[in-house]
């Protein structure tokens, strides 16, 4: 099952409409989150955060929530737009993610994006 989580109701409505047209809506669930809470309890095998982390007010809080939603062996792919996110800002995002209990396990090439693939780090450090 695919869980779609977004702060903007309009984005969820657009996604749900497209899913219905493609006859995929029975495989999907849609959740509106709060600005500081993902508001989802399900554990998943894969989390995709595409071109949105730079819009999060508190990246530490965001990344602290992700490991609890990830199944053992699960992965998280973060992609950020190069047009909005500098190399330095993306490096800072990677550091925050790592201190939140994630380990970089790859940096795939995604067009126009900075990207990193993460898994859970069993030896979680606390972010200061």
Predicted regions: what is each one?
Residues 1-38:
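Class I SAM-dependent methyltransferase SAM/SAH-binding core
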Residues 2, 76-77:
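A short hydrophobic/small-residue beta-strand
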Residues 20-25, 72-73, 101:
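Short helix-capping segments at alpha-helix termini
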Residues 45-59:
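A short SAM/SAH-binding and catalytic strip from SAM-dependent methyltransferases
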Residues 60-75:
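A short glycine-rich, Lys/Arg-flanked "PGG" loop and its adjoining helix->strand segment in the class I
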Residues 77-106:
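Conserved class I S-adenosyl-L-methionine
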Residues 100-128:
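Core SAM-dependent methyltransferase catalytic element
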């Amino acid at each position: 099952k695919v869980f779609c989580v977004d702060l903007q109701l309009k984005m969820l409505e657009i996604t749900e409409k497209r899913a219905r047209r493609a006859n995929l809506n029975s495989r999907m669930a849609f959740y509106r989150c709060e600005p500081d809470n993902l508001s989802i309890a399900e554990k998943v095998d894969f989390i995709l955060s595409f071109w949105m982390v730079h819009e999060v007010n508190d990246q530490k809080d965001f990344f602290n929530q992700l490991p609890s939603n990830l199944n053992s062996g699960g992965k998280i792919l973060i992609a950020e737009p190069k047009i909005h996110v500098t190399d330095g800002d993306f490096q800072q995002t990677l550091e925050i993610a790592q201190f939140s209990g994630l380990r970089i396990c790859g940096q795939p090439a995604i067009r126009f994006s900075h990207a990193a693939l993460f898994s859970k780090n069993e030896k979680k450090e606390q972010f200061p």
